[in-house]
UniProtKB/Swiss-Prot annotation:
It comes from Arabidopsis thaliana. Keywords: Antimicrobial, Disulfide bond, Fungicide, Plant defense, Secreted, Signal. Belongs to the DEFL family. Residues 1-31 form the signal peptide. GO terms for cellular component: extracellular region. It comes from the Eukaryota. The keyword DNA repair does not apply. It is found in: Secreted. The keyword Metal-binding does not apply. This is Putative defensin-like protein 305. Disulfide bonds join 31-51, 37-56, 42-58. One of its GO terms (biological process) is defense response to fungus.
C-alpha cells in the first residue's frame, strides 16, 4: 500500500514538474483581459498578444505586416502604427510614418 502511494506521489510530482517547465518554455501567462498580456512579447513587433481562454497568445492570423510603402489609406496607416506601439505621424504619398508616443 505504501509503495502505491509513493508511486502516485512521484507520478503527480513528475507531472507537475514537467508541466511547469513546459509552461515556462512557452511563456504561458494567465490572463482575464488583453491588458494582462501587455508584458508578453510576440515573435514579430507588429502583433499584440491577446487573452484567449484564460491564457495569453500571439495570434497567428495577425503575423502579416503592412509595409511603410503602402496604398491602403489613412485608417490602415493608423492601425499599422498602433500595432507597432507608435502613433501615426503622417501618411503622405503612400508612405506611412509613425512616431514613438511621448512620455
Amino acid at each position: 500500500m505504501r509503495e502505491e502511494i509513493l508511486e502516485i506521489f512521484l507520478l503527480v510530482n513528475f507531472v507537475f514538474i514537467l508541466c511547469t517547465s513546459i509552461m515556462v518554455r512557452i511563456r504561458y501567462v494567465s490572463c482575464k483581459t488583453n491588458f494582462d498580456c501587455v508584458n508578453l512579447k510576440c515573435p514579430t513587433p507588429f502583433v499584440t498578444p491577446k487573452c484567449v481562454s484564460g491564457g495569453c497568445e500571439c495570434p497567428l492570423k495577425e503575423l502579416l505586416t503592412l509595409l511603410s510603402d503602402t496604398n491602403y489609406g489613412v485608417a490602415a496607416c493608423i492601425d499599422y502604427c498602433k500595432a507597432k506601439g507608435e502613433n501615426a505621424y503622417t501618411c503622405i504619398l503612400n508612405h506611412c510614418y509613425c512616431r514613438k508616443p511621448s512620455m
